[in-house]
Structure formats: structure tokens, C-alpha cells
């Protein structure tokens, strides 16, 4: 028979495959998150909603493919926790991580990599460094987070997370641009 009855769900899946098959061909094992690292067993991963988990995996894929990604969700959707899951993944791969944030957000980021009672993910033992946006324009001294700016090995970071990155949309001095 030339006609065969198919469930609507099958037609839907076939349409999705036809639309996204080229994308699926581009996805290789090299850019998919390594499940053997156990990052899905982390405290931060298990605090995420499904949409945040999807975002974290997509970010990792984009970072591995393009060496960069922008997470631009609306206010209140948990960008910080999504970023923390990505940080956990890279730290699981023994990559050093730098978080650049405005001074007003210091306490948020310091809490999540510290062994303090109000850190809900202290068991994940995150070890990222924190610098302020304004530290990029300095070449001497010590950051308020204790890092020596004149001896900092900027090239050692396997991941740089920039919180409130829209603050960089206007030109700055050349010293900070060289580090970026």
C-alpha cells in the first residue's frame, strides 16, 4: 500500500529531524559534555531547573565549538546558577576559571566558592578566581579579592565568565583590551 497511517508524534519528530539534521551532523563527540566527569552529580547541577540544564549544556557545546558564548536570559531566570554549572564542568576538567564581575556582585560570587554556611553548593568546592571589571584597567597592586595583578597569569584560565558583560559595550583603555 502506498499510504501508511502514522502517529502525529512521528510526523513531528520527522519534521524536527529534517529541519535540524544539518545541525546534528555538525555536533561531534568532541564538543559534547564529557559525562564521565560526573558534573551531573554535582550539587549545582541538581539545583538547576531543566531549562537551565539545557542552557548549561548548550553553553558548553558553544564554548567547545566557538570558544565563546553569551548567556542573555531575562532577569530572574538563574543565569548565575547556570554559569556555576558551566564553571563546575570546566573545573571538573581541571581548567582554571576566572569570574569578572562588578564590585556590587562580589559577595554573590565569593559566597559560591567559599566554605560558608550560606553557600548552598559548598560541597562542590568551586575554586574559581574573582576579579572586578575595574581590575582590568589596573596593572599593579592587589585586587580586593587578593590576587596580585602584576603577576597574574591571564593566559592560564580555561574559562572566563563575565557577569554583567554589558558594562564592556563602550570602549575602554588599551591595557584592559589587551587582556580580553
Language model: regions and residue ranges:
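SF2 helicase/translocase NTPase motor core
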Residues: 36-47, 80-84, 88-179
Amino acid at each position: 500500500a502506498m499510504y501508511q497511517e502514522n502517529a502525529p508524534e512521528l510526523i513531528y519528530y520527522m519534521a524536527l529531524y529534517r529541519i535540524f539534521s544539518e545541525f546534528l551532523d555538525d555536533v561531534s563527540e568532541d564538543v559534547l559534555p564529557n559525562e564521565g566527569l560526573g558534573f551531573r552529580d554535582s550539587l549545582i547541577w541538581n539545583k538547576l531547573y531543566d531549562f537551565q540544564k539545557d542552557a548549561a549544556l548548550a553553553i558548553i557545546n558553544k564554548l567547545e565549538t566557538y570558544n565563546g558564548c553569551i548567556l542573555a536570559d531575562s532577569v530572574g531566570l538563574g543565569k548565575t546558577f547556570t554559569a556555576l554549572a558551566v564553571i563546575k564542568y570546566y573545573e571538573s576538567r581541571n581548567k582554571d576559571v576566572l569570574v569578572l564581575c562588578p564590585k556590587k556582585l562580589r559577595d554573590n560570587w565569593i559566597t559560591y566558592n567559599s566554605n560558608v554556611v550560606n553557600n548552598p553548593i559548598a560541597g562542590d568546592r568551586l575554586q574559581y578566581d574573582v576579579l572586578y571589571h575595574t581590575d582590568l584597567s589596573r596593572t599593579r597592586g592587589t585586587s580586593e579579592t587578593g590576587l596580585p595583578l602584576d603577576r597574574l597569569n591571564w593566559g592560564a584560565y580555561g574559562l572566563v565568565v563575565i557577569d554583567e558583560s554589558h558594562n564592556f559595550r563602550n570602549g575602554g583603555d588599551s591595557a584592559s583590551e589587551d587582556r580580553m
